[in-house]
Amino acid sequence: MGTILDKIVEQKKKEVATLYETYTPIKESRKTHSLVESLQQFTVIAEVKRASPSKGDINLHVDVRKQVKTYEECGAGAVSVLTDGQFFKGSFYDLQTAREESSIPLLCKDFIIDKIQIDRAYEAGADIILLIVAALPKEKLKELYSYVLEKGLEAIVEIHDEEELEIAIELNPHVIGINNRNLKTFEVDLGQTEKLGKRLNEEKLLWISESGIHSKEDIIRVKRAGAKGVLVGEALMTSSSIRTFFEDCKVNI
């Protein structure tokens, strides 16, 4: 029996096959917005996340336009949108809706295994593509990263452990994302940010912390580790006061 990540990747292979049968990428280029510029100061990448394998339904019927508008008004430096339908109940339509509402950098959060998914994300309005080291053979990761650059987009290369960190460093990517969630077990440990952040600081690489960030104390912890930003989904999707969360992110250390 495979891990959750194995199941997701198998589903992505089916989706990619369907895309090749039903979708023709557009050729036009368009203006993009830079996450790297946003990360020159501590940044919240605020996520539109309807559901997840670990939590089930989180905010299934969220009004994407309203949520994204609130994020931008509260000071988000970028917005992340889950486009996976099977496990996270998102869609490329959600991404497109977010693009129509917002002019800040937009991340396509999905399990990317093929160039055609990047084409689809580009057409829907993404500026940033998530590439997950754990989900890709090394050569495929390099190929997809090169394609992201070719499209004029930026990438967050996501890691969870030391082995994945070494693979990511070879790419010298725009941004590295330390995922505190183990995608094989979906368990969360904020200690991964502190452990892996030390090496990324030594390499002088731009990096963010992802998953498991719910409180002011968590923000202080990842800031002290050297993160230039945080990607936050569940805490914002269930918050009764999104503005308060953003105020907490302004804490000095």
From Swiss-Prot:
Keyword Transmembrane helix: no
Coiled-coil regions listed: none
Alphabetized UniProt keyword annotations: Amino-acid biosynthesis, Aromatic amino acid biosynthesis, Decarboxylase, Lyase, Tryptophan biosynthesis
InterPro entries in the record: Aldolase_TIM, Indole-3-glycerol_P_synth, Indole-3-glycerol_P_synth_dom, Indole-3-GlycerolPSynthase_CS, RibuloseP-bd_barrel
GO molecular function, one term: phosphoribosylanthranilate isomerase activity
A Pfam family annotated for this UniProt entry: IGPS
One annotated GO biological process: L-tryptophan biosynthetic process
EC nos: 4.1.1.48
Keyword presence, Amino-acid biosynthesis: yes
Gene3D superfamilies cross-referenced by the UniProt entry: Aldolase class I (3.20.20.70)
Catalytic activity: 1-(2-carboxyphenylamino)-1-deoxy-D-ribulose 5-phosphate + H(+) = (1S,2R)-1-C-(indol-3-yl)glycerol 3-phosphate + CO2 + H2O
Pathway: Amino-acid biosynthesis; L-tryptophan biosynthesis; L-tryptophan from chorismate: step 4/5
Family: Belongs to the TrpC family.
Stored NCBIfam families: PRK00278.1-3, PRK00278.2-4
PANTHER family (UniProt xref): INDOLE-3-GLYCEROL-PHOSPHATE SYNTHASE, TRYPTOPHAN BIOSYNTHESIS PROTEIN
Protein name per the record: Indole-3-glycerol phosphate synthase
Species of provenance: Bacillus cereus (strain ATCC 10987 / NRS 248)
Organism taxonomic ancestry: Bacteria, Bacillati, Bacillota, Bacilli, Bacillales
